[in-house]
Curated annotation (Swiss-Prot):
It catalyses: L-rhamnulose + ATP = L-rhamnulose 1-phosphate + ADP + H(+). It comes from Listeria innocua serovar 6a (strain ATCC BAA-680 / CLIP 11262). GO terms for biological process: glycerol metabolic process; rhamnose catabolic process. InterPro entries: ATPase_NBD (IPR043129), FGGY_C (IPR018485), FGGY_N (IPR018484), Rhamnulokinase (IPR013449). Keywords: ATP-binding, Disulfide bond, Kinase, Magnesium, Nucleotide-binding, Rhamnose metabolism, Transferase. This is Rhamnulokinase.
Amino acid sequence: MKHYVAVDIGASSGRLILGKLVNEKLQLEEIHRFKNGFTYRDGHERWEIDQLMQEIFIGLEKVKQLGISECVLGIDTWGVDYVLIGASGEKLADPISYRDKRTLNAVQNLTSEYPREYIYKKTGIQFMELNTLYQLYVEERNLLERAEKILLIPDYIGYVLTGVKVAETTNSSTTQMLNLREQLFDKDLLSHLNIDVEKFAPLTDAGTYLGKVKAEWLEEYDIPNCDVVTVATHDTASAVVGTPAEGENWAFLSSGTWSLIGMELIAPINNEAAFKENYTNEWGAYGTYRFLKNIMGLWIVQEIARMDDYKHSFAEMAEEASNYPYFKQIINVNDARFNNPENMVDEIKLYCQETGQTVPETIGELTNCVYGSLALYYALELEKMTEITGKKIEKLYIVGGGSNVAMLNQLTAKLAGIEVFAGPSEATAIGNLVVQMINQGEIESMRAGRKIIRNSFEIGEFSCGDVRFEEIKERFTKVLEFN
């Protein structure tokens, strides 16, 4: 029996999940979990990338302690951030987080030189200041000139483990530097940044064999001899693979630190309507596209908890929230002011004050405000998606950590007026494992993998119901007018 390890690292935590296929059912075991985050160093918010590597080795040592001497391994992480590699293969600096303030106004500055419509027609990717395109636009020239290669975070981890440099496509597409039609890094865009296309590794599809873990790591650490497979390395791409969807006319919501809501399509949509609504066409696994919108997610609730010194669990916060009427206060969760404020609680209160609403005071009111606002945003985006794609959405599959928040799932079902299916919460790791198993011939296809997922995990169901959607939508429109 083959053993598979998913290295799944998000913006706030990481984990190593051991998986195996037994009687057409996936069995999972969490081997190691660790915190992730950025710290302010050398003038920027930076990821502790060396510490992440140590956590991976700790997890792999735990796998070996289970008596597993060989395994298959795949890596997925958050997107857009990168590591600059020098001529000798060394890391030139710790990677800067997408939440760093260095890209403020970068979209405006670059698009004043290079029209938005032109960039969108080329890439089909939404405009966000965190995109790699704008990070590289403001990167130190000295570092860029010294860099031989630019590797996104999961590709860097794969490189450290195996010595092989690649640019996996699902994650590379989020950079806003891939040409949608040519399916290559866009030389024209890169030349505008004065970056040679050769600084990027060869594009590689999800499901491609990468290589064996280097012998030096087997000597330094007591870890299994692993074959590394390049999975869908963008965590959302893996989460979509791990979505237990069936049939047609469904949408997905990967709910975690970020909310990514969209549809899986076989062809991109980069027309005027998609451009106007800032929709993105990220590449998916096995020739698909993730037509989606990036929305702020549980980050806001996580920050409320942090400001409260974690006195309440997230379950307790949701319970407190249920004691208050929904939609008493509504915030625009995608307002840039909620991206990384010094104090999230104060920012929410100030927003409500500025928009003529009552100010939430308790932890329950604040949580209620955020969950209600997120559900409203989801429903509005599903409406827009239907208009742009011409496809009727009948079901929404919520996966990731947010699938455990029953209140948010139920509010979304009511506002959107469609059935909502929630779970599995570890869809990203599951999608990572499924791609590995397809590579190894244990699962036939992504469709077959999704059937196995449905048979392996409990999926929650939330029915739609009557709610004053149009009235709430009108109130939200008035709130936006204050901005």
